[in-house]
Amino acid sequence: MKQRLLILYTVLLSCLMTVKAADGITSPFVHDPVLAYDGSRYYIYCTGQGIQVYSSADLNKWRDEPSVFDAAPQWAMKMVPGYNGHTWAPDIIFYKGKYHLFYSCSTFGKNRSAIGHAENVTLNPSDPRYKWEDKGCIVNSVPGRNEWNAIDPNVVVDGDGTPWMTFGSFWNGIKLVKLTTEMDAVAQPEEWYSLCKRMNNTLPDSLPGDDAVEAPFIYHHGGYYYLFVSFDYCCRGLKSNYKIAIGRSQNIKGPYLDKDGKSMMQDGGSILMEGDHKIYSAVGHCSVYDFSGQTYLFAHGYEIHDNGMPHLVKRKLNWDTDGWPIVMP
């Protein structure tokens, strides 16, 4: 009898493990998603404890993967009081044979923040080489010293092979800084640029104000660098009014102009996508990639039928005759 029970238990456990390993999640719970493809599977990295991860063979059905970090980086806990390992808004890029992951350490409504950096040679947790090696802080912001917020990184390599990091949330908007050729620090001498700002009243730098812009993502297409940002407010469930705005420039340093020719440093930005109030109350924090010859936009949307919980949004992007992206249904 015990032997039969043991066999039954083994079969049930095997079934449970099979279910866990299967790609069965069609609408993953995500916030601030970015993606990478390793040649066989797609991986989502997003806000969560230790950085949440999903993987998929086809971009349609997903499964949970282990978080990037088992424990919060000690340097970040010391640098950012109140940070407990719930890590925001990562970005990932494959560069010089490694996957470089950048991530945000902060607390809500404050700009005592830091952007960290980790490396791995593979994304597959089953690969014996799999190990995220934390490299520490790239840049941080401190009230009274910086009028910007060091979160929401996006790293892009320009046409000359130079790595740049754009980042920012509220305060004085979106910044751009040159990185070293190893992506492990800010390049010297330092080069800083301002890319996007929404106009607001002057406030003490300890306050975010109403400069509601964040989540920059730069994508190159047809001779232009396109700057995607998110306007207005996330994280309020059904009351969120997040939306995606865009501008473009022939120089990664800017200026970025919207469809009307208005600078994104002067409250410009053409609205690309927002909540339809049928499926999503709001949509934002996007990333853009080319997979299998098709350009895709990924974001999170606050689902009306799930009481405003954030889920993955995936849309194809096409381009109009003037070279501006069009979000397909």
Mark where each language-model region is.
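Positively charged n-region of N-terminal signal peptides that target proteins for export
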Residues: 1-5
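Bacterial N-terminal signal peptides
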Residues: 7-16
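Carbohydrate-active catalytic/glycan-binding domains of CAZyme proteins
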Residues: 19-329
